[in-house]
């Protein structure tokens, strides 16, 4: 996968040389380049922002450097990348979107600052490449750099060969619309607290059922919206019983009791 990131703070992305992302870069699985937006400015002050039309606080990122940057990194006539723009006004970033992005051959990230990027940049870009405005959540950051770090980590770990054990992707939180069950390791007893007996039983069927029930209960307690969004056909009668024990008020309809 090729990834280009444009920012006025390219140093922000130094952590992408570390850990599994660093290995993915070293192996060529992830071809990542970070670019300084000010490269595409032409005045002595390397200006990238100006006051907003209509008044109001803050500054807005000017369209000229962004237009040149996008044309340089995604030349007209070539295979267009998918442009990702982190913004509080974007659609929520989800694990499903991470999987979608992991299937793209080329991603281009535009890191906004101040009050954001002049809207004309995104409208013009949309005429020649897919544009996705994305938000990490209902809060505001100083800029898009932190969001890009999060999105890149979520996407890179889904690329083939990045994780040593691909089975790790199957049972983690959000993989099947649920939060992951609690996890334990050695020792069996720590400060008087024991690992649940079923996990030490060696009975794989019972262990799988316990983890499923715990995942359902944890999701009910912390993210009932995820339970409400589950397709009825993905729940069997034992799942429904677990939801009732967990106190979910209205399990999804359509599953035989």
UniProtKB/Swiss-Prot annotation:
Q: What is its EC number?
A: 2.1.1.228
Q: Where in the cell is it found?
A: Cytoplasm
Primary site of residence = cytoplasm
Q: Where does S-adenosyl-L-methionine bind?
A: 112, 136-141
Q: Name one GO biological process term.
A: tRNA N1-guanine methylation
Q: Name one GO cellular component term.
A: cytosol
The protein's matches in InterPro entries, at most eight in alphabetical order, are given as:
Alpha/beta_knot_MTases, tRNA_m1G_MeTrfase_C_sf, tRNA_m1G_MeTrfase_TrmD, tRNA_m1G_MTases_N, tRNA_MeTrfase_TRMD/TRM10
| GO MF annotation terms | tRNA (guanine(37)-N1)-methyltransferase activity
Q: Which reaction does it catalyse?
A: guanosine(37) in tRNA + S-adenosyl-L-methionine = N(1)-methylguanosine(37) in tRNA + S-adenosyl-L-homocysteine + H(+)
Q: Cross-referenced CDD domains, in alphabetical order?
A: TrmD-like
One Pfam family from the record: tRNA_m1G_MT
Keywords, alphabetical: Cytoplasm, Methyltransferase, S-adenosyl-L-methionine, Transferase, tRNA processing
Family annotation (HAMAP family): TrmD (MF_00605)
Q: Which family does it belong to?
A: Belongs to the RNA methyltransferase TrmD family.
Its quaternary organisation is:
Homodimer.
Q: What does this protein do?
A: Specifically methylates guanosine-37 in various tRNAs.
Q: What is this protein called?
A: tRNA (guanine-N(1)-)-methyltransferase
Q: From what organism does this protein derive?
A: Salinispora tropica (strain ATCC BAA-916 / DSM 44818 / JCM 13857 / NBRC 105044 / CNB-440)
